[in-house]
Amino acid sequence: MGTLQGGLRKVVARVSREQQETAAEGVAVSIRHVGKRFGSVAALDDVSLEIRRGEFFSLLGPSGCGKTTLLRSIGGFEAPTEGDILIEGRSVLHLAPYERPTNMIFQHLALFPHLDVRENVGFGLRMKGADRTDSARRVEEALRLVRLEGYGERRVDQLSGGQRQRVAMARALVNDPAVLLLDEPLGALDLQLRLQMQEELRRLQRQLGATFVFVTHDQGEAMAMSDRIAVMSAGRLQQVGTPAEIYERPANRFVATFVGHANLIEARLTGGVAGGIAEAEAAGGLTVSGRAPTQRSADGAVLAVLRYEKIRVRAAEAAEPGVPATVIERTYMGSSLRFTCRTAEGVLLTADSPNAAPERDIGEGAAVRLSWSPADIALLTD
């Protein structure tokens, strides 16, 4: 019995030490081997990641990938089937949503139409029995933070969509959460308002130095706002990194296709590696050497990922070096032009060029030369 008790004390001490170390390392949220099943469907499959204190972290992926389930698990609205979730070094699985140091902003906001702005913002404080004087001060501070001074007595139905978003933000921030959870809060807004609210959210996050965990399926939104991004698919993490790392160095085919536009070229390694660049060749002998893959398949097969905007398009008569090709389709996209070209080897490549001379003078059927840097090609084996 004494041996068992001693063992239990050691386990408790080890867990407590790990939690203290997590908090000391500046980790706001630690997701440890979290799984969630709905019947036979795995919504989350062995997800592990750490979200740093004070960062804007986005969960990005298509519908049904598990990103909202993960967010709801952090907030306590879903219970993981397995694994653990720590916030500020403390496991929160046993805590109800209102007991966790988090607040959530939902896509549909859930504002109370029968309450004015001030009452909506202060609702959580009132439910906690906070001091009235202190609550009034904090509500006014929150309204000032989201630039809604003077709107306290307005009804929710008297506000624009953007103003309602700000009320929802103020209501969440007034409780001073350690982590703010945002479940696609901008999804229902039109484009211009969405862009404005992106800037507003980023400004707030930087001003407060708070930890924001943001769910979105919009890659542009995630790129513009995030310090780091976790790309998810089918309940699994595909890649975690900065926007630049995700875009420039995709971990696999899914990330390469889901984030941004890219030419995907089946190729084979043909030589060694020099300066981090591996020699590779596609069908017909087209050279697509690029950044060496982290591992090599037995047959040397790779996927060359070349972003549209990395390709330079020039008229053949310009006598610039490059791959000979013919423009088979030209699409006007406003600020840019999209050229679909067939190389002499028969490979189709798409390039995005600025809507400016000399590119805008190139039409369909034109002979062109395509060029790019090997450093702009990512060679993948996954």
PLM regions: where:
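ABC ATPase nucleotide-binding domain helices that frame the ATP-binding cleft
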Residues: T68-L71, V167
